[in-house]
């Protein structure tokens, strides 16, 4: 697969790719140096190459020569139809053509090979996702019937999803519903932003604890847009701590302070109510200790 970019202004090749994709800086350099970047039909292998407006850039797949190392993912439930797992931070949910990281999806398929034939071929078993820097609870479909039912449940919003988020500042209201439509940012395809005419998006929050410069929130999703919690909290002036995309402050965290802490839903095949809770990961607990 290829990634296509149209240059909008005069810009260095490496900066142009970085601003239009979510590759890391080292990945951008690797793409260019391995002759995987084509500009107006010609391979460019110098990161300092100046690109003119309206130039067409094609990024080809970069094949990693490193052997994949699989991890055993923490599980909360495993049966013949579903698996409830805890995704670590700094792990993508499923592979994209532009990312060579081993995904949660690949780790799960390595442990449960039968999932390979469930759902979409490029993201088997996946019915919802968490951002790379977000940790916590996820449901994986293990059977085709469960996959279809879970997708329907997600669409009908019958799965309750709660998150813990540490944000900058102190919201004026102890509890609130953020009802603000979200669109893809026309200036940055990686980002989303609130805009009239966007897709309906609702997020509620409740303050769990206030600190001097921060607030710990219990956040609940009522829709599932890309980056929804991060976009909504930034929109009301309280971005998530450690969020390098929507925040403008540096943090000592190696990830965003956003954790999928609770899932409640009826089993897709057994109609039995299930509830799972996941404690904050150690890094987030330690950060709370430093600000208390």
Segments (PLM) and residue ranges:
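RNA pseudouridine synthases
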Residues: 1-292
């Amino acid at each position: 697969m290829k990634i296509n970019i149209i240059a909008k202004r005069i810009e260095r090749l490496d900066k142009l790719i970085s601003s239009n994709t979510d590759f890391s800086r080292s990945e951008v350099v690797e793409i260019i140096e391995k002759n995987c970047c084509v500009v107006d039909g010609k391979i460019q292998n110098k990161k300092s190459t100046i690109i003119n407006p309206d130039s067409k850039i094609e990024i080809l797949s970069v094949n990693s020569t490193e052997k994949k190392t699989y991890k055993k993912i923490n599980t909360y439930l495993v049966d013949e139809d579903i698996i409830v797992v805890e995704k670590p931070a700094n792990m993508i949910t499923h592979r994209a053509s532009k990312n060579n990281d081993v995904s949660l999806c690949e780790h799960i398929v390595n442990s449960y090979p039968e999932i390979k034939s469930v759902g979409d071929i490029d993201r088997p078993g996946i019915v919802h996702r968490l951002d790379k820097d977000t940790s916590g609870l996820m449901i994986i479909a293990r059977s085709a019937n469960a996959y279809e039912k879970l997708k329907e449940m997600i669409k009908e919003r019958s799965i309750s999803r709660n998150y813990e988020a540490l944000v900058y500042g102190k919201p004026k209201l102890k509890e609130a519903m953020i009802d603000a439509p979200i669109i893809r940012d026309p200036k940055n395809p990686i980002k989303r932003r609130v805009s009239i005419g966007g897709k309906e998006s609702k997020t509620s929050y409740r303050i769990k604890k206030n600190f001097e410069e921060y607030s710990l929130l219990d956040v609940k999703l009522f829709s599932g847009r890309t980056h929804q919690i991060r976009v909504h909290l930034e929109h009301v002036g309280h971005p998530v701590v450690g969020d390098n995309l929507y925040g403008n402050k540096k943090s000592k965290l190696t990830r965003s302070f956003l954790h999928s802490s609770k899932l409640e839903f009826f089993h897709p095949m057994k109609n039995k109510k299930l509830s799972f809770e996941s404690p904050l990961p150690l890094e987030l607990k330690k950060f709370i200790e430093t600000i208390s």
